[in-house]
């Protein structure tokens, strides 16, 4: 290497393999904020992970039935989503899907809501900024199929 030159060139990330159109989703999101929907979709696309946005408990139940034996790995809640009432829906989902992780995100100033979300069964509650920052790791961890998890 010549003096004065560094090998710290940015490395291009390899393109993910194309996702099968019939792949079951293991991650569901109750998010109606368009900014966060776009952020989640773009991150999932880059990681080749399928995330489905649902608007009601009935939508989630229907999608889970269509997946057959494969259970959801992660359910994401925007805790400020008034259309689904997360604090009443989370305990119902946790009782039906005990092994499913539930992650909520909210404004960093909503300490009371954070506490209530933990009390009703939310496994992790993050401020919006931390959720955005950790989104790739969360999707990567929960997006692998059950067969891939047993191999790794």
Tell me what each language-model feature is.
Residues 1-12, 16:
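Long, low-complexity intrinsically disordered regions
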Residues 25-34:
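Conserved acidic segment of CheY-like receiver
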Residues 109-124:
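Alpha4 helix (beta4-alpha4-beta5 surface) of REC/receiver domains from two-component response regulators
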Residues 76-93:
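Conserved phosphotransfer microenvironments
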Residues 100-108:
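A short, hydrophobic beta-strand element within the central beta-sheet of small alpha/beta folds
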Residues 121-136:
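Output/docking surface of receiver
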Residues 35-52:
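Two-component/phosphorelay signaling modules centered on CheY-like receiver
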